């Protein structure tokens, strides 16, 4: 029994380590794309050689053209409260293998953020499944293959959004997931903190 507990503990710590690193790296990668879109166009081109996807190679060319024309934007500041809203969704959806922006209790991204502070000037959410590579995650969200309106790309390059928070973790269907939440501004609350012990699935 002690051996089983030790194995489970080590497994949890390993998952926490990669998840935390991935979330931080995704935000850094998003800020690189925002502040240096022309440079990121070259990165995207090198990462998508031979890409077919849902819409075919044209979707990559369209994303590259977008980046080449995009004006640099300020980097997103990070927010602990927004991160906690993202983490709440990871902990809710990951174990069940469900996907989407609606939580198991019907909550939307702005509802989850609002439990850890007050968001200002709009809010949004991006989710990526199955990647454990930050650059691969952000490239996929910018290409936004098969997504009508390119909503994930618009969130990344929104002039309205000034702060963000990300969380990653295990997903029963895809192996992993990463949630990135955005807001125009955020006033942090000091009363609630998201954690794997504090937030059982569906509690938010």
Language model regions located:
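Short, well-ordered surface patches within globular domains
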Residues: 20-116, 153, 159
């Amino acid at each position: 029994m002690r051996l089983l507990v030790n194995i489970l503990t080590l497994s949890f710590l390993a998952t926490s380590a990669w998840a935390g690193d991935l979330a931080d790296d995704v935000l850094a990668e998003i800020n690189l794309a925002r502040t240096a879109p022309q440079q990121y166009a070259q990165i995207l081109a090198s990462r998508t050689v031979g890409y077919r996807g849902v819409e075919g190679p044209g979707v990559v060319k369209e994303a590259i053209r977008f980046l080449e024309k995009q004006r640099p934007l300020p980097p997103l500041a990070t927010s602990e409260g927004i991160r906690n809203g993202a983490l709440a969704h990871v902990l809710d959806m990951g174990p069940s293998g469900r996907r989407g922006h609606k939580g198991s209790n019907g909550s939307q991204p702005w509802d989850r953020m609002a439990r850890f502070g007050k968001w200002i000037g709009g809010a949004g959410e991006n989710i990526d499944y199955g990647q454990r590579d930050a650059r691969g995650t952000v490239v996929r969200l910018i290409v936004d293959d098969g997504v009508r309106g390119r909503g994930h790309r618009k969130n990344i390059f929104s002039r309205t959004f000034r702060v963000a928070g990300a969380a990653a973790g295990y997903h029963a269907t895809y192996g992993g997931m990463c949630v990135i939440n955005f807001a125009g501004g955020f006033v942090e609350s000091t009363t609630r903190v998201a954690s794997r012990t504090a937030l059982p699935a569906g509690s938010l």
